[in-house]
Amino acid sequence: MFIRALYLMLIALLIPFYLQAAMTISGTRIIFPASEKEVNIRTNNRGDKPALVQVWTDDGKVNGDVNSVKTPFILTPPVYRVEPGRGQSVRLIYNGTALPKDRESVFWFNMLEIPPKEQGVANNKNKLELAFRTRIKIFYRPSSLTESSEEQVEKLKWSVKSASNGSKLVSIENPTPYFFSFDSAAVKNGSIGADINIDMVPPFTRLEFPVKNSPSVTNNITAIDFRSINDYGAAHQHHLIWQNQAFILKDPTPQS
């Protein structure tokens, strides 16, 4: 019994290195304009076996009960089967629940891929089956917001402060009605950098993020590099320099 359990644990540890989900979502985020009643989400089966899929939305609680989570969206179909090499469009329908009109709201789209039962194979207690879950953000954008977050990136206010333990924190103030997501960020001292443990910054908020300890960098921070993510999921590189007691956006001039 112990050897069998140990064997299964070993297999579970090795699985992430060679298994991946067959089902994919077209895009890494969903922009839902308030002017639309619904948007379509394309899902595709890139595997060689049929896939059973369940989809739902949530408000950010990763482990919340699917049946009790309340969001202003309806998904149809909520459960479906996709043959190998085929796709399925899912309708994301806004149910009319009142949402703020002066800022974006964020929710999550979830897709759970359930592996099919192999026909003709006897039940095997040692067989390990995995279900793959994918989550992407849904940004509900009021009609009054006519630009994208990327067009507002220069309005973010960055600063650096010291925590009580001596480590550095990067503060980001977002005075805009848009959510800002980041691929990466780092403080710089010349050519040397230290990563910032950055996360999404909601509208009209200020958040602080810790910097990876690196005294050669954090004792003299002269710049900040970051990659913001636009509406299409693409990352854009930005560069801030310390000038006149503030971090100023100094992106390179685009090449013609």
Indicate where each model-derived feature is located.
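Asparagine-centered strand-capping/turn motif at beta-strand->loop junctions
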Residues: 41-47, 170-176
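Beta-sheet-dominated interaction scaffolds and their linkers
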Residues: 21-44, 148-165
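Short, basic/aromatic beta-hairpin or loop at an interaction surface
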Residues: 59-69, 182-187
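Intrinsically disordered, low-complexity Pro/Gly/Ser/Thr-rich segments with frequent PxxP/GP/PP motifs
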Residues: 64-98, 190-218
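Terminal connector regions
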Residues: 95-146, 216-256
